[in-house]
């Protein structure tokens, strides 16, 4: 049930006091880092949220809070201005016992905090933790109310949180944010219910957290990855400090070496389109993906143990040891029309240099050819480069080299946690429980293990200034203050090189398939390949997948002593149905049509980084008035370089943070403004975040056309041994058609 402060403040005060006095008190099992004491929490689920309107005048473009809502236990309290929130917040602080706290969840803490910061700084900000300036995870006020960001902690939207943890479900649809509402704007009951609904969900989430995260040895983590870290630490048991000390001794002595490896050696998943098939509407495409790609790499391969020690460049790859090297490649040329080396990881190239570099050919952000180019690689990636590229061995120079003590399997405390969750996930799926909360938790933990191994050192230090601004800490000269390298590695308990090697192994497996079957593979995306089915090469690919799977199952049988729940780990799984239509436009940009057994019909899906699912189909219907399923040729022709999604369909928003002094040198100002009903009202404008709808442009920067021309120019001047490869490829396509594009 909800209550408005402006109408029922006396009743609200009585209810809050009554609920707090009756509530159970629970003690956190982990000491507070600042106070060194165990925090006590009032066991009442709580949530906070604001509703805002954009305010545009001749001078200002800002936003205004016209409604706030705060839930506590089974009740929701609301108000129509930040002035009333001030009164409410001051009262609730006064009723919390001095040694207790309220845990309050927020669905977008950075956003809501910025509107309220001028009001919060009247009290002490007793604790705060943030990943970046705009991304606080914890804001604690006066040692009494702990605001916690919930979306990052649980790794899902508020709607999904409601679905997974709460009785109350997110209401479908949104408030019409184009309507300007102010504090005196009458709200319809459905609008009030929308406000009420979100904080109800947050309160129920709080109840779930108290039941599941405040046991004898449990504590609420900051993020989902933090929870995994706790699982691994528990697996270490009494050896935790011993293991942690050893791992920290493996960190590079030289801080610059660590940052060099972190910036240039660590690479993400491999994604891309076969350049000769980019922007082509293709038929009958098969899809296969690795089962739990990263977890399989963690189980199947060996990893660096010990500290990277700088050694002679002559030692690179001289023994069966892990190596890292900075290598300047000479006359580097891809053996196929696929490119695997990212231009962003080239150490000697700036973005500006790339634009005017005639001796380098860029294929959609990746290096296809370069006269000279420098990369930081490990021994696994070097083997992949040798597989995918030709280069002049004699002129290629190893600039620097590091070696590790040995290769070894990942330690038991990692693999035990990973494999326990993988087995649980597989067992639940086999028993038809893949829609359960238990399955989701297990799957998230399996997928999160890789992320935990490649977490960067936390170096930044932030402060909250007198205006409530979260900002980087700076010294007297204005230079940004960061934690020292030696201080930062005190929190390390896993080798950062394990994560770097996991991605190298994952990429190498994909590269192996791409290089062996370059003509029929159309698209690849981290752990999957899309390939044509109408050629002899595709038949050989299917045979190779079958052979690979047999070998993979034999390895699993050996590692897991015949446990059938692990038999498919790392195997390639083929989709049951072909994609009747497919088109690729580069990394993370493709669209396809495929039969879906759940829908019992064909579905059209697009995967475009930064674009909401279903957006392209909505825009197509809006622009053409046609149904996608009935106009496939027109739809796939519509999906092309230069496609624009307008503001109404993109649902993308840009954020502008109103700085201090924005209002003619002041931090706040009173103005008269009209709501959507033309009701005039005097409002106070202060700190705010302005959300502006923006369009989405899908541009490929003319790389497609330029690259084809480059291929033709290179082909005409190629050595004979290279020409043979290209002749085999070119024979598979209608070359004149490519030139016409």
Give a label for each model feature.
Residues 56-60, 113-120, 205-206, 231-235, ...:
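A short acidic (Asp/Glu
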Residues 130, 520-525:
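Short beta-strand
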Residues 48, 148, 280-294, 442-446:
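Conserved catalytic palm subdomain of right-hand nucleotidyl-transferase polymerases, strongest
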Residues 2-104, 115-137, 258, 263-281, ...:
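Conserved RNase H-like, two-metal-ion catalytic cores of nucleic-acid enzymes
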């Amino acid at each position: 049930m909800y209550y408005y402060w402006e109408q029922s403040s006396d009743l609200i005060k009585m209810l809050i006091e009554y609920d707090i006095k009756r509530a159970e008190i629970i003690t956190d099992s982990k000491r507070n880092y600042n106070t060194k004491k165990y925090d006590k929490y009032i066991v009442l689920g709580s949530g906070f949220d604001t509703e805002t309107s954009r305010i545009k005048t001749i001078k200002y473009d800002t936003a205004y809070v016209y409604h706030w809502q705060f839930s506590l236990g089974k009740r929701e309290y609301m108000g129509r201005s930040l002035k009333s929130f001030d009164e409410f917040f001051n009262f609730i602080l006064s009723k919390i016992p001095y040694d207790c706290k309220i845990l309050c969840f927020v669905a977008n803490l950075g956003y809501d905090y910025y509107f309220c910061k001028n009001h919060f700084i009247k009290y002490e900000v007793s604790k705060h933790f943030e990943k970046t300036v705009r991304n606080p995870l914890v804001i604690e006020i006066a040692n009494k109310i702990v605001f916690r960001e919930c979306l990052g902690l649980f790794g899902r939207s508020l709607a999904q949180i409601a679905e997974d943890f709460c009785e109350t479900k997110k209401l479908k649809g949104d408030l019409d944010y184009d309507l300007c509402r102010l504090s005196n704007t009458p709200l319809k009951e459905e609008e009030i219910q929308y406000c009420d609904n979100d904080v109800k969900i947050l309160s129920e989430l709080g109840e779930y957290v108290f039941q599941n995260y405040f046991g004898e040895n449990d504590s609420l983590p900051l993020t989902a990855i933090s929870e995994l870290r706790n699982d691994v630490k528990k697996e270490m048991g009494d050896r935790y400090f011993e293991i942690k000390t050893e791992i920290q001794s493996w960190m590079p002595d030289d801080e610059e070496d660590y940052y060099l490896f972190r910036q240039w050696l660590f690479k993400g998943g491999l994604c891309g389109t076969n350049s000769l098939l980019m922007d082509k509407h293709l038929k009958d495409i098969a899809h296969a993906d690795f089962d739990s790609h990263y977890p399989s790499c963690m189980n199947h391969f060996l990893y660096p143990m010990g500290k990277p020690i700088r050694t002679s460049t002559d030692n690179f790859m001289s023994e069966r040891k892990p190596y890292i090297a900075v290598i300047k490649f000479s006359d580097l040329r891809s053996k196929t029309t696929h490119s695997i080396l990212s231009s962003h990881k080239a150490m000697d190239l700036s973005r500006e240099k790339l634009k005017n570099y005639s001796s380098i050919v860029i294929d959609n952000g990746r290096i296809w050819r370069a006269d000279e180019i420098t990369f930081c690689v490990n021994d696994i990636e070097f083997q992949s480069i040798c597989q995918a590229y030709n280069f002049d061995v004699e002129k290629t120079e190893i600039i620097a080299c590091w070696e590790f003590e040995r290769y070894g399997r990942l330690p038991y405390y990692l693999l035990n946690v990973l494999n326990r969750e993988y087995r649980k996930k597989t067992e639940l799926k086999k028993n038809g429980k893949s829609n359960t909360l238990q399955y989701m938790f297990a799957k998230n933990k399996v997928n999160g293990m890789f992320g935990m191994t490649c977490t960067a050192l936390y170096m930044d230090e932030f402060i909250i200034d007198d205006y409530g601004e979260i900002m980087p800490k700076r010294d007297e000269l204005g230079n940004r203050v960061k934690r020292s390298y030696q201080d930062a590695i005190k929190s390390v308990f896993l080798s950062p090189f394990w994560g770097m090697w996991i991605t190298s192994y994952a990429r190498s497996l994909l590269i192996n398939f791409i290089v062996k079957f370059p003509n029929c593979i159309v698209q690849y995306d981290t752990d999957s390949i899309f390939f044509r089915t109408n050629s002899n090469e595709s038949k050989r690919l299917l045979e190779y997948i079958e052979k690979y799977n047999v070998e993979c199952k034999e390895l699993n049988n050996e590692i897991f002593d015949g446990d059938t729940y692990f038999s498919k780990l790392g195997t390639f799984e083929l989709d049951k149905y072909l994609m009747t239509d497919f088109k690729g436009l580069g990394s993370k940009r493709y669209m396809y049509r495929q039969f879906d057994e759940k829908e019992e019909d064909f579905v059209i899906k697009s995967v475009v980084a930064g674009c909401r699912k279903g957006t392209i189909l909505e825009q197509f219907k809006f622009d053409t008035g046609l149904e996608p399923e009935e106009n496939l040729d027109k739809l796939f022709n519509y999906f092309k370089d230069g496609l624009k999604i307008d503001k109404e369909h993109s649902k993308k928003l840009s954020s502008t943070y109103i700085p201090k002094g924005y209002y003619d040198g002041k931090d706040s100002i009173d103005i008269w403004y009209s709501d959507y009903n033309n009701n005039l009202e005097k409002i106070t404008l202060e700190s705010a975040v302005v959300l502006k709808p923006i369009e989405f442009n899908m541009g490929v920067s003319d790389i497609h056309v330029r690259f084809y021309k480059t291929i033709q120019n290179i082909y005409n001047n190629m050595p004979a041994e290279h020409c043979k490869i290209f002749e085999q490829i070119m024979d598979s396509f209608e070359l004149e058609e490519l030139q016409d594009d």
